[in-house]
Amino acid sequence: LFRSKGIYVYERKYGNKSITVLMNGTDKTQTINLTPYKEVLPTTSAHDVLTDQNIDLNKNLTLPGREMLVLEF
């Protein structure tokens, strides 16, 4: 579990699947620099299972307050 400025990031693995969850625990929209989380972000793109969209992990992410991303690799 990583925590920084109200952003929580954790990873779960099962077999050859990996899920990384990013949660904004604050009420404010936050821009997340993903560089510190490269250990749990094994590729440069991921599938967001909540929105069914592909996410580019080469750039910063914006996460609204009290929202989360569930990324599948």
List each model region and its residues.
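Carbohydrate-interacting/catalytic domains
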Residues: 2-73
